[in-house]
Amino acid sequence: MKVAVGVHIIADLYGVDARLISSSEAISPIMENAIQEGHLTKISSEYYQFRPMGASGIALLAESHLSFHTWPEYGLVTLDIYTCGDRSNADRAFDYIIKVLKPTSVDYRKMERGSQIKEDVRITDPQMML
Amino acid sequence: MKVAVGVHIIADLYGVDARLISSSEAISPIMENAIQEGHLTKISSEYYQFRPMGASGIALLAESHLSFHTWPEYGLVTLDIYTCGDRSNADRAFDYIIKVLKPTSVDYRKMERGSQIKEDVRITDPQMML
């Protein structure tokens, strides 16, 4: 049986109000709230402020990761939400971000990650690998 | 004129020797070296060890990000290298990782991010956005 390990939403958001995405202070609550809305488990998160404007944020999750990179000069956010486990979690986090940022258009793709894995190749004895 | 802000390599690596990817100690030098090989600028990196095995690593780069998630029980690494600037940097980092991990097969995609941006929509006065 084939199994995929996770689902990855890859979205470029256009026409976002630059004031919402110019600073790390602006994007950090959006990202942190998206993690909560998605019922995701944060291991750590890191934000960075570019000069004169623009920000990046990346969160390491127990379920994989979530990242934000912003170009306020273009009204652009490039967003990745990659989660394992309950597939609706990524959707919930994504829907929250769209609700807050209100892009005028979105280039959206959703990918299966690890989709060539077959359950029967699973190595069941972890000691084999140490 | 249309411009893309970056290039994103999305790759699932299969058939990787589980010993190379079972621990955060094993993957961290690979990731850090890939950043150097790609001439990328690290802002921060974070690693996490799953029990009984498997690891995640994520690096925030001035050029965007690089992430690793491993499932040694499947011989699987899901890898993302997303960079702005010189497009050959992502390729160099990717080539290094492939050379070290020697997967038996790779599901590889390369995407333009922010590809709907038009240069003429650029807002040139940053004060407009503050």
Swiss-Prot record, chains A, B:
Catalysis performed (reactions): S-adenosyl-L-methionine + H(+) = S-adenosyl 3-(methylsulfanyl)propylamine + CO2
Organism in which the protein naturally occurs: Picrophilus torridus (strain ATCC 700027 / DSM 9790 / JCM 10055 / NBRC 100828 / KAW 2/3)
Protein name: S-adenosylmethionine decarboxylase proenzyme
GO BP annotation list: spermidine biosynthetic process
Higher taxonomy: Archaea, Methanobacteriati, Thermoplasmatota, Thermoplasmata, Thermoplasmatales
Assembly and interaction partners: Heterotetramer of two alpha and two beta chains arranged as a dimer of alpha/beta heterodimers.
Residue numbers carrying Pyruvic acid (Ser): 64
Pfam families: AdoMet_dc
Family statement: Belongs to the prokaryotic AdoMetDC family. Type 1 subfamily.
